[in-house]
């Protein structure tokens, strides 16, 4: 019962806050809420194996790491913006060095299957266009020893 009352209260408060707002203002408010919630998907700074410097938003920045027998997935950059202020294009430059195990840098968009950007020792450079909705760039590792340098603008 308390959950229903709480949910109804949020709906009413939200309605009052948005009353008198234009369609664009409502969309901007919604976009801000969705973007704030999306940062939960990113791997926390303390849980990362390397060093991350945030760029102008959660979609951009640099990440460098040296891995030693690491297995797991790190979601490094991204979010769920409906209308990203900096546009839909991202420039990605990545250098991956695999000494042992496997590692792949990927891009996942919405409910689509992840797209592998690089999974062998070498470099990757491209510009991708983000569709609306959730977009994340990460690295998936299995007993991975090696390094990564990732720059996204």
Predicted regions mapped to residue ranges:
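Edge beta-strands of jelly-roll/beta-sandwich modules across compartments, strongly enriched
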Residues: 141-153
């Amino acid at each position: 019962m308390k959950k229903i009352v709480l949910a109804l209260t949020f709906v009413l408060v939200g309605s009052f806050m948005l009353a008198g707002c234009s369609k664009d203002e409502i969309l901007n408010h919604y976009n801000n809420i969705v973007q704030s919630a999306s940062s939960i998907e990113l791997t926390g700074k303390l849980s990362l194996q390397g060093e991350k410097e945030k760029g102008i938003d959660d979609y951009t920045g640099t990440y460098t790491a040296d891995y030693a027998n690491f297995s797991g997935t790190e979601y490094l950059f991204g979010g769920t913006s409906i209308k990203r202020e900096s546009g839909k294009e991202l420039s990605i430059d990545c250098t991956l060095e695999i000494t042992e195990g496997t590692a792949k840098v990927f891009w996942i968009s919405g409910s689509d299957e992840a797209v592998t950007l690089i999974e062998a020792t070498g470099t990757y450079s491209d510009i991708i266009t983000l569709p609306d909705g959730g977009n994340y760039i990460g690295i998936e590792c299995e007993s991975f020893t090696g390094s990564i340098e990732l720059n996204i603008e």
